[in-house]
Amino acid sequence: MIRILVSNDDGVNAPGIKALTEALTEIATVLTVGPDRNCSGASNSLTLTNPLRINRLDNGYISVHGTPTDCVHLAIRELYDGEPDMVVSGINAGANMGDDTLYSGTVAAAMEGRFLGFPAVAISLNGRKFEHYQSAAVYARRIVQGLLAQPLAKDQILNVNVPDLPLDQIKGIKVTRLGARHKAEGIVRTQDPAGREIFWLGPPGQEQDATEGTDFHAIANGYVSITPLTVDLTAYGQLTALQNWVDKI
């Protein structure tokens, strides 16, 4: 039977990972390994200065005192008896579109699976109330089944964003590119109860590029967005111009 590793960045007890695990258990043997706390914004960070501690939970999940990337790396390298056929990360409580992907622990967990040689998908639910995890779970299962039936190129990650809508209100799937946000809003300066100065990072910026063809546009119009991401960050279109610049300095 197909074997799928499920992880996330919201934590192993988050509702999204539960909905995803249950949906994929219908088609595969699932191992669920997630952080023991919310690690949103962890990106691709690894824990290198402390040991990783795990806890095997009563529901069969494994919690890790580490980052999403730690979870996937540890699961594949040590916790799995053999190897998974695929890595699926999510369902994230919140969008991972445009610039979000660089900060996202959800995308990073999928990326680690891709680094280690496995097909990988990141699933996120875009909304404010996060009421329709089941809608995202249905699309996650559909996409995973599609990948199993017709595998895609091995150098890509599928970044999937689902609008927080009832299933019958979602219009379908759009293949998209990443949009872009304006820079994040300002830092919030305040004090703790002892009067010491503390700071909170402001919320992400509003959409800057949400034109047709972007993930932002698809979600705003009631579609699921699928964006292929690559691990290779090289700006190939700039290589010649950069070489010409280097030759002159």
Swiss-Prot record:
SUPFAM superfamilies: SurE-like (SSF64167). Pfam families: SurE (PF01975). A divalent metal cation binds at D9, D10, S40, N92. Its main location: cytoplasm. Gene3D superfamilies: Survival protein SurE-like phosphatase/nucleotidase. Transmembrane segments: none annotated. It comes from the Bacteria. Binds 1 divalent metal cation per subunit. One of its GO terms (cellular component) is cytoplasm. Its cofactor is a divalent metal cation. Keywords: Cytoplasm, Hydrolase, Metal-binding, Nucleotide-binding. It is an enzyme of class 3 (hydrolase). InterPro entries: SurE, SurE-like_Pase/nucleotidase, SurE-like_sf. One of its GO terms (molecular function) is 3'-nucleotidase activity. It is found in: Cytoplasm. It catalyses: a ribonucleoside 5'-phosphate + H2O = a ribonucleoside + phosphate. Its EC number is 3.1.3.5. Nucleotidase that shows phosphatase activity on nucleoside 5'-monophosphates. Belongs to the SurE nucleotidase family. This is 5'-nucleotidase SurE. It comes from Shewanella baltica (strain OS155 / ATCC BAA-1091). The gene is surE.
